[in-house]
Curated annotation (Swiss-Prot):
UniProt cross-references to SMART domains, sorted A to Z: Aldolase_II (SM01007)
Cofactor (UniProt): Zn(2+)
Matching InterPro entries: Aldolase_II/adducin_N, Aldolase_II/adducin_N_sf, MethylthioRu-1-P_deHdtase_MtnB
Record GO terms (molecular function): methylthioribulose 1-phosphate dehydratase activity; zinc ion binding
Name this protein carries in UniProt: Methylthioribulose-1-phosphate dehydratase
Gene Ontology cellular-component annotations: cytoplasm
Family in the record: Belongs to the aldolase class II family. MtnB subfamily.
Keyword Lyase belongs to the record: yes
Length: 218
């Protein structure tokens, strides 16, 4: 009698399961906050030197299961999983390739992020200045600083968008960016770091929009 052989995976399957549960808990909180409407948004965590754990495309972020987190290589190709990764996987993997220290990338679609991306699309960036919460970003120890958040044009061609992000990363340090009419990407060395950057940007963008309303610009 011949035994059925299961092909070995090039990554630690138990580690993928561990990361799946870690991500699902956080994603569920974002979904409850309304930051992942209509199955939008995607999230990832470095699995090992050559692989990333990332959400499967088109899943409702309010009720993810372990099988909704899959592995891809650093070129964005599915590994050991029959499903399709997020359509924007390349925007995740480019960061993991470029920065070996990055451990987590978060992409959300909150109302605040989307409106801010539309308001500041013409300028191409949002300048956040003199906020105490700027100290939430890695490397910032004072409020007396300015953080520029880029706003990129939306496109369905992820190669073009990834190239634009890479070009700007050559010129400035970034903790996140907006895509016009779309949402926001943030990242960090750990999930906690990435989440802190996301929450800080969400709050500061809300502040900027409220200031525009108070001044009669919106």
């Amino acid at each position: 009698m011949n035994a059925t052989c299961t092909p070995s995976l090039p990554y630690d399957a138990s580690r993928l399961r561990e990361l799946a549960h870690l991500l699902i808990g956080t994603i569920s909180e974002f979904a409850q906050a309304g930051w992942t409407p209509a199955t939008s948004s995607n999230f990832s965590h470095r699995l090992d030197e050559h692989h990333v754990a990332i959400t499967v495309s088109g899943r409702d972020k309010r009720c993810l299961r372990e099988e909704d987190i899959m592995a891809v290589d650093l070129d964005g190709n599915a590994v050991g999983h029959p499903h399709t990764p997020s359509a924007e996987t390349l925007l995740h993997t480019q960061l993991y390739r470029r920065f070996p220290e990055i451990g987590c990338v978060l992409h959300t679609h909150s109302l605040t992020q989307t409106v801010a991306s539309r308001v500041y699309a013409g300028a191409g960036h949002i300048s956040l200045k003199d906020y105490e919460l700027l100290k939430a970003f890695a490397g910032h120890s004072t409020h007396e600083t300015t953080l520029d958040v880029p706003v990129f044009c939306n496109t369905q061609n992820m190669n073009i968008l990834a190239a634009q992000v890479d070009t700007l990363l050559d010129k400035q340090r970034m903790w996140g960016y907006l895509i016009n009419g779309h949402g926001m990407y943030t990242w960090g060395n750990t999930l906690a770091d990435a989440r802190r950057h996301l929450e800080a940007l969400e709050f500061l963008l809300h502040c900027e929009l409220d200031l525009l309303k108070l001044r009669g610009y919106l």
